[in-house]
């Protein structure tokens, strides 16, 4: 079960709390799903900040507030004394839903455009000897070396990570991959 509760912060003898969404079995200061506010009972006046829209959302999907959080939410006007939601979510949320329903109904009536045929050829990459993957993600003919632009690594068939790598570029030879600045996994960069 998901709970809305307080997570203790602050120093010894000076507690401050974060209002968090957490699993009911998680420890008090353990892992949590989301922080929706904070509460400082030591400050004068007491500081309470809770994101009402997120509190309403979590209450609407079944999160159970602790007794202290019920009191804080009651003071903010989000829940009644029993912890039940007061009123509905803001009307701003309903307007996009109505617009989306209208758009869906118009789309159902509107004629469907025919998609352009998929190119059988791959687009040339930024580097010599490289091409982009085909539309289905497969390798173009003659290109077997996968290149990952985020890590600047290339993977040859049969290497450890070849099957798990998603190719962002395909190279025809190892030399063209290295000329483009890519390196084999396990090698240190030249920097």
Swiss-Prot record:
One of its GO terms (biological process) is translation. Keywords: Ribonucleoprotein, Ribosomal protein. InterPro entries: Ribosomal_bS16 (IPR000307), Ribosomal_bS16_dom_sf (IPR023803). Gene3D superfamilies: 3.30.1320.10. The keyword Ribonucleoprotein applies. GO terms for molecular function: structural constituent of ribosome. GO terms for cellular component: cytoplasm; small ribosomal subunit. Belongs to the bacterial ribosomal protein bS16 family. HAMAP family: Ribosomal_bS16. This is Small ribosomal subunit protein bS16. It comes from Herpetosiphon aurantiacus (strain ATCC 23779 / DSM 785 / 114-95). The lineage of its organism: Bacteria, Bacillati, Chloroflexota, Chloroflexia, Herpetosiphonales. The gene is rpsP.
């Amino acid at each position: 079960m998901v709970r809305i509760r307080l997570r203790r912060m602050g120093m010894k003898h000076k507690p401050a709390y974060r209002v968090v969404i957490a699993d009911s079995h998680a420890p008090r200061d353990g892992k949590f799903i989301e922080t929706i506010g904070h509460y400082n009972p030591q400050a004068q006046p007491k500081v309470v900040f809770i994101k009402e829209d997120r509190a309403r959302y979590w209450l609407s999907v079944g999160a159970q507030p602790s007794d202290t959080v019920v009191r804080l939410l009651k003071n903010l006007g989000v829940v009644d004394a029993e912890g039940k939601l007061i009123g509905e979510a803001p009307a701003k949320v309903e307007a996009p839903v109505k617009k989306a329903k209208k758009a869906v109904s118009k789309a159902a009536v509107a004629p469907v455009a025919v998609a352009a045929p998929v190119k059988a050829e791959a687009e040339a990459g930024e580097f010599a000897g490289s091409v982009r993957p085909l539309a289905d993600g497969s390798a173009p003919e003659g290109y077997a070396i996968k290149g990952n632009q985020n890590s600047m690594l290339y993977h040859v068939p049969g290497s450890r990570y070849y099957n798990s790598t998603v190719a962002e570029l395909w190279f025809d030879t190892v030399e063209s991959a290295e000329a483009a600045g890519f390196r084999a996994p396990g090698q240190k960069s030249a920097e």
